[in-house]
Design a protein with these regions (language model features):
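Non-catalytic, solvent-exposed segments at the cell envelope interface
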Residues: 2-327
Length: 327
C-alpha cells in the first residue's frame, strides 16, 4: 500500500513537471510567432576598402583596422525608428549597440550619434537610390536602405561585425511602457516645461511617465541638443529595463508579448528563444554605457547644404568602443 501511494505521488509530480514544460514550450513558441522576421541572411565582411572612391583620409585610417569579432560578446543593434508612414524605413533616431558580454556578465550600451559623418555603401533600396551619396550622416543609411544598410555602414566605419538588429517603432514602444505601468524619469525644469507645453501634466524632479509622455520626452531636442536627445532615449530604455527587473516573473509574460509583437528583427526564432530562456540570468547583469563619438575626438561641422554633422577621429573612437565592450 505504501509503495502504491509513493508511486501515485511520483506520478503526480512527474505529470505536473511535464505539464509545466509543455506549457512553457507552447508559450515560447507563441512568443516567437509575434515579431516580424527579416530573413535576408548574414552580412559579409567587406574587403578592398582601400579602393573605395570618395573616402576621406581620416575614414581610411579607421578602415585599415580589422573588423572586430569576439565569440563571448553578442552584439545586437537596437534601432529606434520614427516612421511617419508604413511604406518608408523611417529615420533611425536611436542607434544603440547592445553588447552582451558573457565573460564579465555585463550589458554594454553604445549610443551612436545619428549625425556622425560616415561612408555609406551603395546598396540602397531602389526607391531611394537617387538620394544616395558616398558620405552622409549615419542615420541616412537607415533611411535609404533600412536596417541592413545601417549594419553594413556600421561595419565599414566602426569595424564591428554586427550581424543582428532589433528594431522598434517609437510609437509602438508606447504600448510597452504603458503595460509596465510607466517608468520613472527625472526631469529638469526645462524638460518639464517643454512637456507641459505639449499637454503633459509634469513637474521637475522624478516623475512616473506613461508611454505618450515618454515618447514626447525622448523626442525633445529644441531645448538643448541632438546629443542630449540621445541621452533621453537611452534614459527611457534603461528605465524600462530597471522597471522590468523589479517586476514579478508572473507579470513579465504580458510585457514580453507586447515587446515581441512590436519587434522587427533578423535574429532567427531559435536565437530569440535562447535570449528569452536567459532572461532571468540577464536580470543580474550590470549595465554600463557610452556615447560615440567620444568627446575629445570629434569636431562639429556643417555640410554644404547647411546640416550640422560630426567628423571624428576614427582610430580613437574604434579603439574606445572595443575597450568598452570588452570590460
Amino acid at each position: 500500500m505504501r509503495k502504491s501511494k509513493i508511486a501515485i505521488t511520483l506520478g503526480l509530480v512527474v505529470g505536473i513537471v511535464l505539464s509545466a514544460f509543455a506549457f512553457l514550450f507552447g508559450y515560447t513558441r507563441y512568443l516567437l510567432s509575434l515579431p516580424t522576421y527579416d530573413t535576408e541572411g548574414t552580412i559579409p565582411i567587406e574587403t578592398n576598402l582601400e579602393q573605395l572612391p570618395d573616402v576621406e583620409p581620416e575614414m581610411k585610417e579607421g578602415m585599415k583596422i580589422p573588423v572586430y569579432n569576439n565569440p563571448q560578446i553578442h552584439n545586437i543593434l537596437l534601432i529606434g525608428s520614427d516612421r511617419r508612414d508604413d511604406k518608408s524605413y523611417g529615420r533611425s533616431d536611436s542607434m544603440i549597440l547592445l553588447s552582451i558580454n558573457e565573460k564579465t556578465d555585463k550589458f554594454h550600451l553604445t549610443s551612436f550619434q545619428r549625425t556622425i559623418w560616415v561612408s555609406i555603401p551603395k546598396d540602397t533600396d531602389p526607391r531611394y537610390q537617387r538620394y544616395w551619396s558616398p558620405n552622409n550622416a549615419l542615420n541616412a543609411a537607415h533611411t535609404w536602405g533600412g536596417p541592413r544598410l545601417l549594419l553594413k555602414t556600421i561595419q565599414r566605419n566602426f569595424r564591428l561585425d554586427v550581424q543582428h538588429y532589433v528594431k522598434v517603432d517609437f510609437k509602438n514602444f508606447v504600448k510597452v511602457i504603458d503595460r509596465v505601468g510607466g517608468v520613472e524619469i527625472e526631469l529638469t525644469e526645462a524638460e518639464a516645461s517643454h512637456l507641459r507645453g505639449q499637454g503633459h501634466q509634469v513637474t521637475a524632479g522624478k516623475q512616473l511617465l506613461k508611454g505618450d509622455a515618454c515618447l514626447a520626452y525622448s523626442r525633445i531636442r529644441r531645448i538643448d541638443s541632438d546629443w542630449k536627445r540621445m541621452g533621453r532615449q537611452r534614459t527611457v530604455i534603461e528605465a524600462l529595463i530597471k522597471k522590468m527587473r523589479s517586476m514579478s516573473p508572473l507579470s513579465l509574460p504580458r510585457v514580453l508579448e507586447d515587446i515581441m509583437r512590436n519587434l522587427e528583427t533578423n535574429l532567427t526564432p531559435g536565437q530569440l528563444q535562447s535570449y528569452i530562456f536567459n532572461v532571468l540570468k540577464y536580470r543580474k547583469y550590470e549595465i554600463d554605457q557610452m556615447f560615440v563619438p567620444i568627446e575629445q575626438h570629434k569636431a562639429r561641422t556643417k555640410t554644404k547644404s547647411g546640416h550640422e554633422v560630426y567628423k571624428i577621429n576614427w582610430v580613437k573612437n574604434i579603439e574606445a568602443i572595443r575597450a568598452f565592450i570588452e570590460q
